[in-house]
């Protein structure tokens, strides 16, 4: 309203422009509707002046934010006045005069309006006259035989009856029916999905097929999901295949109607790179300079001294007032709200029209709309929200199950995978987990040889323990020492034994923290839930510190020692927002186990499925293929007559595994449609490049991409010869040949080149071209061609590290696969490099990072000197110095590192 009432507002300046009368009509119409609403009983009208900041403390940022907005508007062809904040008294009161009496000054006069129950949950009954609770009960009873073919155990039936009673008393049945409807539809389309989070605590969700973890067998607590004390609606997160999630989202819009369905918003905040770029534009810095600042200074922006040091390294003039002001203002903007984004999958569904309840806005993606409030606002208002999330590994598993059925005639799904397979666990204990879900990261691979998971619950702990929460709470090392029998497991009381027995006396899960607070410190269930919420929102609320006295004093009153009480609080405080719910860890552990089982028993299937699911995970296709080859899988190159779009399986030579045929999807620059055209016209097989050009009707550029990927070897033409042949082709025929083609079913080539013999490409050049065209090579490794020179320098191979003495000083050189800097590592960076024999894990301390910053961040081929560090089967190299050896690649860039994932 303030925008309409302000004479110098943007719409006002547009009135004299063509079409300005329409702006006046729209404004008048909006004000008239507001006047009608103002007179409606039971409505509280409010008129405000222009809103600038929420707090006086951010007034320094307000001009810079206004300037950023102004630049954006000017770029779009409109120049509003920049002096909107300097208004006369008459202008400031114009809004008040327009609606006399509507300006509310004291905030105490505005009372919270009660929400109208029943407007927020869609009706999901399937039969006339049947209530939602009756429908839910009927569906659960009908689904029981599918989950328990031999009959449900008595404890399961008791738990289901308890849950249904609680769901009915809280009127949550429509919510369960809505989620069940969405999951059933997704599965009817062949989309793999699985609920996770606290929903895995529910036997009702398990029986309906929403989740895949049996909570009764796993001992999960239903009250972590729903309880009468919490009085808040349940929250069910459902993961769908990432590349098919949009199908589910659009079906929800169609099924419930766009007037009843919308996604939540997220508040996107200024990060260092964006803050430097935007402030640099406002202050008129050259674009190349702002690019340099965002690239080299952003990571140190929060530290003024380090920021100046890096600017000096770049040769920047620190006496330049604009430069120092850029750093200062960008630092002020860090964490400040920038714009609204779209929540990854938080769907709000209502019975009434959404636009009568909440403000809506369209998104940049066609076919979507969002509510301009975030998920926390939605939770407070008690709207029904379903999280429709994407998980790439589910798509990978679905593709793997399809290949298992096609190639090995084995039907498999998540529920049918053999449980507690010893061979799978032996593979996991060796950290042979590249490509698997959740346990493939550097940190997980380092932990697996120490944890040695041998049961599913071990895997649940493995998923949960390599998290910032347990690390910050100093829970990891005590647990590992107790697991390795290096430290005795003691329990100060039998109560704690019952709570922490499964995790050897160390609280690893949120549920355990709640139970410790209830049973050992005298918290009520409601207070324990407040503790859980405090742990989940520590960034906004300041953590669990307000609960310290109550927790410690409560434990002292129950006979626990002061030291133990303080230690317990410190561990819970360390959880922060990263304390993992046990149910969430169990859901992820199931997918981790399924992916590890497939990799162990069908590495050919797993490799093909993983390649067809890219991009996802930590590792590039090159590492996935090399890992499959180490497991005895034959990988065959892209072939114009044998490849399909996806990677496929063919009869292998060794009889044990099928061979993986790389698909057209691996060819950089080749469109899916062109790949489909090549396959559709391939009956019978192509006989030459000219034959492909005639029959497939794809652009010459597509043929060039295939030639660069060496896909025409079946014709006896290697990469250079194929590229030479394609030079004689064109997308559009010349008039003479076009006239000759009118009586033919196919065009003639424009130029018939004489046969020539081109020199063969060297093996090294061929490998480099493979990487450039497909991101991998089956013909060798780039570092292998440098090995002779590296050996003379005393550089060892990555594959030799297990056989070298602990503490020895060594030199290594390899391609950089990834760089990681976890928030819990106190600035330490972890780098993985690779040569022709394997990988090596580097630890780069903070002081070494600063000294060798450029080679560390810019190198594709990195050389290091360091000290070998061994702890059991875990091997690292602690870096002492670094050198950029990228020039040895002679201009070739084999692959791009997957940094900071």
From Swiss-Prot:
GO terms for molecular function: 3'-5' exonuclease activity; DNA-directed DNA polymerase activity; nucleic acid binding. DNA polymerase involved in damage-induced mutagenesis and translesion synthesis (TLS). It is not the major replicative DNA polymerase. Its EC number is 2.7.7.7. The gene is dnaE2. Keywords: Cytoplasm, DNA damage, DNA repair, DNA replication, DNA-directed DNA polymerase, Nucleotidyltransferase, Plasmid, Transferase. The keyword Transferase applies. GO terms for biological process: DNA repair; DNA replication. Pfam families: DNA_pol3_alpha (PF07733), DNA_pol3_finger (PF17657), HHH_6 (PF14579), tRNA_anti-codon (PF01336). Belongs to the DNA polymerase type-C family. DnaE2 subfamily. This is Error-prone DNA polymerase. One of its GO terms (cellular component) is cytoplasm. Signal peptide: none annotated. It comes from the Bacteria. InterPro entries: DNA_pol3_alpha_NTPase_dom, DNA_pol3_finger, DnaE2/DnaE/PolC, DNAPol_HHH, NA-bd_OB_tRNA. It catalyses: DNA(n) + a 2'-deoxyribonucleoside 5'-triphosphate = DNA(n+1) + diphosphate. It is found in: Cytoplasm. Gene3D superfamilies: 1.10.150.870. It comes from Gluconobacter oxydans (strain 621H) (Gluconobacter suboxydans).
């Amino acid at each position: 309203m303030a925008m309409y009432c302000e004479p110098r507002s943007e719409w006002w300046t547009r009135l004299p422009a063509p079409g300005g009368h329409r702006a006046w009509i729209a404004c008048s119409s909006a004000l008239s509707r507001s006047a009608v609403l103002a007179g409606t009983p039971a409505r509280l009208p409010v008129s405000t002046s222009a809103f600038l900041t929420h707090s006086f403390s951010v007034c320094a940022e307000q001009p810079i934010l206004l300037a950023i907005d102004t630049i954006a508007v000017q770029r779009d062809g409109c120049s509003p006045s920049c002096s909107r904040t300097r208004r006369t008294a008459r202008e400031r009161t114009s809004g008040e005069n327009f609606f006399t009496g509507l300006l509310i000054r004291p905030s105490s006069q505005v009372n919270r309006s009660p929400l109208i129950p029943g407007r927020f949950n869609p009706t999901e009954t399937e039969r006339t006259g049947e209530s939602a609770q009756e429908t839910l009960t009927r569906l659960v009873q009908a689904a029981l035989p599918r989950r328990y073919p031999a009959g449900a155990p008595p404890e399961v039936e008791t738990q289901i009856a308890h849950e249904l009673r609680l769901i009915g008393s809280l009127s949550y049945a429509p919510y369960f029916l809505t989620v069940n409807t969405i999951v059933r539809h997704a599965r009817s389309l062949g989309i793999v999905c699985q609920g996770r989070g606290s929903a895995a605590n529910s036997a009702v969700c398990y029986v309906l097929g929403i989740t895949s973890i049996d909570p009764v067998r796993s001992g999960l607590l239903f009250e972590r999901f729903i309880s009468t004390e919490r009085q808040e609606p349940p929250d069910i997160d459902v993961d769908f295949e990432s590349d098919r999630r949009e199908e589910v989202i659009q079906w929800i819009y169609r099924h419930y109607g766009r007037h009843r369905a919308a996604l939540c918003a997220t508040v996107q905040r200024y990060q260092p790179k964006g803050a430097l770029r935007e402030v640099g534009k406002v202050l008129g810095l050259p674009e190349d300079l702002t690019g340099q600042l965002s690239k080299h200074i952003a990571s140190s922006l929060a530290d003024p001294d380090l920021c100046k040091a890096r600017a000096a390294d770049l040769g920047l003039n620190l006496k330049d007032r604009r430069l120092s002001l850029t750093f200062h203002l960008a630092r002020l903007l860090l964490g400040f709200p920038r714009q609204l984004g779209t929540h990854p999958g938080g769907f709000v569904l209502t019975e009434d029209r959404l636009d009568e309840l909440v403000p809506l806005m369209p998104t940049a993606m066609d076919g979507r709309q969002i509510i301009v409030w975030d998920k926390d606002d939605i939770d407070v208002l008690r709207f029904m929200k379903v999280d429709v999330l994407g998980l790439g590994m589910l798509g990978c598993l679905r593709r793997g199950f399809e290949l298992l059925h096609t190639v090995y005639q084995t039907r498999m799904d998540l529920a049918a995978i053999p449980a507690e397979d010893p061979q799978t666990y032996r593979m996991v204990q060796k950290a042979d987990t590249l490509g698997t879900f959740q346990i493939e990261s550097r940190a997980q691979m380092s932990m697996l040889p120490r944890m040695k998971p041998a049961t599913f619950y071990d895997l649940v702990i493995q998923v949960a323990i390599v998290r910032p929460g347990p690390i910050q709470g100093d829970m990891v090392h005590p647990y590992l020492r107790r697991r390795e029998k290096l430290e005795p497991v003691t329990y100060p009381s039998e109560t704690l034994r019952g709570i922490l027995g499964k995790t050897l006396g160390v609280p690893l899960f949120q549920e355990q923290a709640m139970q410790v607070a209830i049973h050992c410190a005298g918290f009520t269930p409601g207070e324990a839930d407040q503790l859980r919420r405090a742990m989940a929102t520590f960034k906004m609320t300041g953590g669990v510190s307000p609960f310290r006295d109550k927790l410690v004093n409560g434990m002292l009153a129950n006979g626990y020692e002061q030291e133990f009480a303080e230690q317990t609080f410190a561990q819970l405080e360390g959880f922060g927002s990263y304390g993992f719910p046990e149910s969430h860890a169990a859901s992820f552990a199931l997918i981790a186990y399924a992916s590890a089982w497939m990799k162990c028993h069908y590495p050919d299937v797993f490799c093909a499925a993983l390649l067809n699911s890219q991009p996802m995970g930590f590792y590039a296709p090159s590492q996935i293929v090399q890992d499959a080859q180490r497991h005895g899988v034959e990988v065959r190159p892209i072939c114009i007559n044998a490849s399909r779009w996806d990677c496929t399986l063919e009869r292998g030579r060794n009889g044990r595994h099928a061979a993986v045929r790389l698909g057209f999807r691996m060819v950089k620059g080749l469109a899916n449609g062109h790949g489909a055209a090549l396959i559709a016209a391939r009956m019978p097989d192509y006989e030459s490049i000219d034959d492909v050009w005639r029959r497939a009707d794809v652009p010459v550029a597509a043929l060039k991409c295939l030639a660069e990927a060496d896909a025409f070897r079946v014709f006896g033409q290697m990469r250079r010869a194929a590229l030479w042949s394609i030079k004689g082709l064109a997308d559009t025929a010349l008039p003479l040949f076009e006239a000759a083609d009118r009586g033919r079913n196919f065009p003639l080539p424009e130029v018939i080149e004489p046969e020539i013999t081109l020199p063969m490409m060297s093996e090294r050049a061929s490998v480099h071209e493979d990487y450039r065209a497909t991101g991998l090579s089956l013909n060798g490794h780039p570092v292998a061609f440098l090995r002779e020179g590296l050996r003379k320098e005393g550089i060892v191979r990555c594959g030799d590290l297990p056989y070298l003495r602990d503490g020895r000083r060594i030199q290594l050189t390899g391609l950089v696969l990834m760089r990681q800097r976890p928030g819990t590592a106190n600035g330490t960076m972890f780098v993985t490099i690779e040569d022709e024999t394997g990988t090596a894990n580097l630890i780069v301390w903070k002081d070494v990072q600063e000294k060798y910053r450029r080679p560390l961040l810019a190198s594709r081929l990195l050389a290091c000197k360091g000290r070998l560090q061994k702890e059991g089967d875990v091997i690292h190299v602690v870096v002492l110095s670094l050198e950029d050896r990228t020039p040895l690649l002679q201009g070739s860039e084999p692959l791009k590192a997957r940094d900071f994932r």
